Amino acid sequence: MLEANGISEDEVTLVANGKHQTAYATLTSGEVDATIIHNPYAALAEAEGTGHILGRAWDYIPDYYTGTIVASDRIIKEEPEKLQRFLNAYYEVHEKVKNEYFDEFITWLAQQMDVSEDVMRKAVEDEIDVWSDYPVIPEDRVEKTVEYLKEYGWLDENVQAEGTYTNEFAEKAAETLGLTDPAEK
């Protein structure tokens, strides 16, 4: 994001300021001038007049993959049917929330996060375009994510994406639920 706006790392001080409420508190207290933060805190900053959304990370690095469900080797090997049922249910709920129960979801989530429904609606609507309707991880995005992580020194050069993930269960969930790859539409 800095590079895309002509700012070098030498022009800023990078601070590990936590996440969620902690990162939001560093912004509202003036401890930091800017932060990368998840919603609803970005929307909350605008609503409270303590900050402005300057950009979304995925607009700068759209191939960076962040949405991940992780399972242990044990459950994959010993209880794959349980994992499959979980993923089927997860993606079924995902689709129903997005397409049938959106307002109820906003009400529930606002209560869980202790923010107003207006703030939560803005937070979710600001990000709804990146809610993937297809659970299968595109291999090229995984490769690109690994490249980014190596480029910025967050991942050892010897680490490869191959063998670190599986689409087996996501493919079965997509088939079971009738979800189609948006790239094929």
Where are these regions (language model features)?
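Residues within well-ordered alpha helices
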Residues: 1, 44, 108-109, 148, ...
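Hinge/capping helix and adjacent helix->loop/strand transition within the periplasmic-binding protein
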Residues: 1-13, 22, 77-81
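A local structural motif
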Residues: 3-17, 31-33, 117-118, 155-161
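Residues at alpha-helix termini
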Residues: 5, 48, 113, 152-153, ...
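Pocket-lining segment of extracytoplasmic ligand-binding domains
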Residues: 21-111
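Short secondary-structure transition/capping segments
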Residues: 47-49, 66-68, 130-132, 169-173
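Secondary-structure end/capping motifs
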Residues: 77-157
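Conserved C-terminal helix/tail region of periplasmic/extracytoplasmic solute-binding proteins
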Residues: 147-185
